[in-house]
Swiss-Prot record:
Keywords: Membrane, Mitochondrion, Mitochondrion inner membrane, Repeat, Transmembrane, Transmembrane helix, Transport
Mitochondrial matrix side: 159-194, 260-313, 369-413
Main location: mitochondrion
Protein name: Mitochondrial substrate carrier family protein Y
Family: Belongs to the mitochondrial carrier (TC 2.A.29) family.
GO CC annotations, alphabetized: mitochondrial inner membrane; mitochondrion
UniProt Solcar repeat ranges: 135-226, 236-334, 350-436
């Protein structure tokens, strides 16, 4: 019994449970409820989780909102700061505008003052430039005048001898004969007229030669400066020198012609009346002066009479001065530009050598190449009747036919010596004065 009961219980228990589980409606409902509850619980759990997540999200949102609020606050603060900065900037702009207005006023005042100062400065600059230019021109004029007087004085005795030789029938250039003629005429002048006779007629050409030299040098330098401004002549400087010298020669011919005419009339006073071309009153031993011959020429021929011999003068001076200045400038460059230093007597003398050699050589080239025209000028100007020669080339033709080709260089020995020494002295004086 006990065993059976046990078995039955066991079985019953199991069975009961199973039966209860399967067949009892309440249990089924309970189970369903439990299931539902579990589901609900699960749902609740899920909802709780969702709520937690929502809460977290809300917290995050709140944090974000707080951050945004903080950012907004920061932005507001920045905006406030910017507004303050803008206000400050506006104030600064206002201050700057005021300062700018003041600066503009000051600038305008300064401009007015500067304009006034510039006008004063320009006036002073013009005045300074004018004075500087005037000083240079005055120095150049003084140098030219001094050069002309020194040149004329140094070469005048030989110029007188040259004129006498050119007018004589016996003096022929070359060899000992010419040297004898120079010495002979030199002795004759001193014997018959004294030492002062070597300077007969000097007073008029002395002053006028200074004027001629001033015009000659001034015109040459100004013309040369003009030519050298042009690129073509910068690349062909020799042409600049030739053209400038030619222009200076053309201008000076209109001054030297009347001067030489009066000078030659005075120089031939000592020639014996038996010689042709003497045209003087030797019966009166008292020499006539410049004023006498100036009045005589004007009375007989008028103003145009002073330009007797202008044609050969132009033939001599236009190409002559072109050669003269070109030779001088070229040789001076070859010898080296001298510095007129006074450091010692030896250096002072050495600095003169390039000038002396350049100036003297230029004079010899000038008169050597134009000497036939100088002879024609002398013969035409010594013919007071102005009927013997029809012109320059007619004069040269007659000289050539009557006396041979050598006569075209009659008196050149005296001319060469005179040209070298007078032009050497002339350039030396000029360079010394303008470099002082």
């Amino acid at each position: 019994m006990e065993n059976n009961n046990k078995n039955i219980n066991t079985t019953n228990n199991s069975t009961t449970i199973n039966t209860n589980n399967n067949n009892n409606p309440i249990n089924k409902n309970n189970n369903n409820n439990n299931i539902n509850n579990n589901n609900n619980n699960n749902i609740n759990n899920i909802n709780n989780i969702n709520n937690v997540n929502n809460n977290n999200n809300n917290n995050n949102n709140n944090n974000n909102n707080n951050n945004n609020n903080n950012n907004n606050n920061n932005n507001n603060n920045n905006n406030n700061n910017n507004n303050n900065n803008n206000i400050n900037n506006n104030n600064n702009n206002i201050n700057n505008n005021n300062i700018n207005k003041k600066n503009i006023n000051n600038i305008n005042k300064n401009k007015i003052n500067n304009n006034n100062n510039n006008e004063i400065g320009e006036e002073k600059a013009v005045e300074g430039g004018f004075l500087a230019g005037l000083s240079r021109n005055v120095t150049r004029i003084i140098g030219s005048f001094s050069s002309g007087m020194a040149e004329e004085s140094a070469g005048y005795p030989l110029d007188l001898i040259k004129t006498r030789i050119q007018l004589s029938q016996s003096g022929v250039s070359g060899g000992g004969g010419t040297n004898t003629s120079i010495i002979k005429i030199f002795k004759d002048v001193i014997k018959t007229e004294g030492v002062i006779g070597l300077f007969k007629g000097l007073s008029s050409p002395l002053i006028l030669s200074a004027l001629v030299t001033a015009i000659q040098f001034g015109l040459f330098e100004d013309t040369l400066k003009y030519f050298r401004k042009h690129q073509y002549f910068k690349n062909h400087d020799t042409l600049s020198l030739l053209f400038s010298g030619s222009i200076a020669g053309f201008a000076q011919s209109f001054i030297t012609c009347p001067v030489d005419l009066v000078k030659i009339q005075m120089q031939i006073q000592g020639i014996p009346s038996s010689q042709p071309n003497s045209n003087n009153n030797n019966n009166n031993n008292k020499a006539k002066g410049n004023s006498y011959f100036t009045k005589l020429i004007y009375r007989e021929k008028g103003l145009l009479g002073f330009y007797q011999g202008l044609s050969p003068t132009l033939f001599r001076d236009v190409p002559g001065l072109a050669i003269f200045f070109t030779t001088y400038e070229t040789l001076k460059k070859q010898f080296g530009q001298p510095e007129l230093s006074t450091q010692s007597p030896t250096e002072f003398i050495k600095s003169f050598i390039p000038i002396v050699l350049s100036g003297g050589s230029a004079g010899v080239f000038y008169h050597g190449l134009t000497h036939p025209f100088d002879i024609a000028k002398t013969l035409i100007q010594s013919d007071r009747s102005a009927t013997k020669y029809k012109g320059t080339f007619d004069c040269l033709k007659q000289v050539y036919q009557n006396q041979g080709p050598k006569s075209l260089f009659k008196g050149f020995s005296a001319v060469a010596i005179k040209s070298f020494q007078s032009n050497a002295v002339g350039f030396l004086v000029y360079e010394m004065v303008i470099n002082l």
